[in-house]
Amino acid sequence: MQKEATATSHKILFLNTLAFTACFAVWMINGVLVTYLATNQVFDWGPIEIGWLMGIPVLTGSIFRLPAGMLTDKFGGKPVFVILLFICAVPMFLLSYANDFISFALCSFGFGLTGASFAIGIAFTSVWYPRKLQGTTLGIFGAGNAGAALTTLFAPTLLNTYTANGTNMEGWRMLPKVYAAMLVIMGIIFFLFAENKKPASSNKTWVKMLSPLKNIRVWRFGFYYFLVFGCFVAFSQWLVPYFVNVYYMPIVTAGIFAALFSFPSGVIRALGGWMSDKHGARKVMYWILGTSTLISFMLIVPKMDIYSPGKGIMAQRSGIVTRVSETEIDVEGKKYPLQVKPTTFENLDDQVLVFPTKEVWQESVVTEGQKVLKKELLAKGVTRIYFQANVWIFAVLVILLGSIWGIGKAAVYKHIPDYFPEEVGVVGGMVGVLGGLGGFFCPIIFGYLLEGTGLYTSCWMFMFILSFVCLVWMHRSIMKTSKFSSGLE
């Protein structure tokens, strides 16, 4: 770390953030591209195949974050970042020639290395700034997560343009070529303008560099990051098919809504860094995990239209049914009024309904001339419950959740320079690995949950459980170490 920030520090921060934004945009391309190809039946892929193709790039990027962080600590960020950008451009370009699931998966595995750029940028940014600015600067760098929003916002429009609005589906192959060119251009810019710098620990052996991984705190931070980053990555992709299938949106519109989730989450990360510097990461994380638990719980209830047996009418005495109408049943002079089906549910989708709506009515089950006994059913009750899961309310909650996770991402990484100032690359890489694994496993888990339950909201059930476990683990850990804590945990 430097004692003071300089103009060179700010230049490196800008280049790191720019390169990370480009890499993150590439990393998230399958969320849009795979959904587009499956929706338009270019390839016959179901939810599980889609989940795997979304997860494979994230897996690659996650696994290689640790070695990327170690290489950055050893050789500095410039050579590692430049090599990564050029290498990843190759499989990104080859994706344009993929014709089946296997070739798509192999190319996705290759360009997924762009996800390792996070560990490089974290370590390379950290060495240029003093400890007091670590939260803010790492938060600014992390705003490169907004690259996901750039993909979900612009890639659907580009796909429509290249395919002539679906009349030439082979035109999709142009999109990977454009993304590959972006990586090459970014690599050239980084090579020409970045300056290299190594941390003081660069002379350590590889084994010595890995020693912090014995500390349980590293794994706990990684578990938090599994939620706030891994799930952010997962939903940056999963929300596109979510909006398409649940709210019947065109893919371009779904991409815009997904971008509204991912863009604020990326940009607000800088605010999370500032908040962590000012108030302490512990307080911020309490708020993040508690709010994540609450919002996830609120999103669990699915969009539904349920019919259930309600309060019926039974005969008070035996007799012959003399008249049956929509409003009344007459049994030898004994009249039984019926609740008529209301018109409450007409044009419900044109309204904004926050809570479930109910209507109740009764329908005759007897006919004129029929003999009925005492307590025999004359009319059955019907209860209809409709929950709109209004798209605007859903979108607001999802955007709020994404923004909260964005602040949480910065809060998690605020801990690392404080506890491991000379091993930021290794520890940051390992935490990034665990967080990135969330981005890999979650779309796959979502796919299996969807297959098993038939409910798209099953993913929010998983988020609720995960958020609650993180909150409990953090609280128990803080209680155990509070007498030794200095305010950062």
For each feature predicted by the language model, list its residue ranges.
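Extracytoplasmic gate region of multi-pass secondary transporters
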Residues: N30-V34, I216-I268, I300-M304, K409, ...
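Glycine-rich segments within core transmembrane alpha-helices of 12-TM secondary carriers
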Residues: G135-N160, G432-C442
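C-terminal ends and interior cores of transmembrane alpha-helices
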Residues: F86-N99, T291-Y307, R384-F387
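C-terminal membrane-cytosol helix-exit motif in multi-pass small-molecule transporters
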Residues: A180-A200, C470-I478
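Extracytoplasmic
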Residues: K11-T39, F43, T152, F235-V240, ...
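Conserved MFS/SLC helix-loop-helix module at the cytosolic interface between two early adjacent transmembrane helices
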Residues: I63-F101
